[in-house]
């Protein structure tokens, strides 16, 4: 999950560049979806890649307009599987 904060609260500059140049994501970095807060100050974007350097490359293309925070995330299903696997290992026989 990528949290983008538009510098100077200038979402318009970000959207202008997007219209002119597209997402500018390198091959191997997949855009999934995004949500923008109603104040047009932050974007919460889900990207997917096995190679963190591709994410860094993409962020460098936007770093003059956007500040980034990156949070590795997994699906709820994956979280449940991890928890179940851990809980199963901790159970003691009766």
Task: Please identify what each model-predicted range represents.
Residues 59:
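Short, flexible helix/strand-to-coil boundary loops that buttress conserved ligand/catalytic motifs
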